[in-house]
Amino acid sequence: MRKCNVLELGCACGGNLIPMAARLPDSYFLGIELSPEQAQEGLSRINELGLANCDIRQADILDLQDEGLRFDYIITHGVYSWSPPEVRERIIELSSRLLSP
């Protein structure tokens, strides 16, 4: 797929998203990270590379609101297995709501 929308929950500093965004400039990549320091580090890398198709937002998964965006892929590498039950339930809820049909 050459054009897609990708959401990563628990993206840290963008180690997955940034290389994909560089490789797929017609796609959109959004990362959500709880740690303000990790999110800021990722944003700094995105800005240094001039990637207009990638963004990282500092937020708690439990507080995410539906902004109308839909995603072809949702990545939860590590986060799902390391999180408490309420976060895992929220990840499933978000995935079912935000995945493109």
Q: Model-found features: residue ranges?
A:
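Conserved class I S-adenosyl-L-methionine
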Residues: 2-12
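Conserved SAM-binding loop of SAM-dependent methyltransferases across substrates and taxa
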Residues: 13-26
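Conserved SAM/SAH-binding beta-strand->alpha-helix loop
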Residues: 35
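Conserved SAM-binding loop
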Residues: 42
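Conserved SAM-binding strand-loop segment of SAM-dependent methyltransferases
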Residues: 50-61
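A short acidic, Gly/Pro-enriched loop at the edge of an enzyme's catalytic core
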Residues: 65-74
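Residues lining the SAM
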Residues: 76-80
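A short glycine-rich, Lys/Arg-flanked "PGG" loop and its adjoining helix->strand segment in the class I
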Residues: 89-101
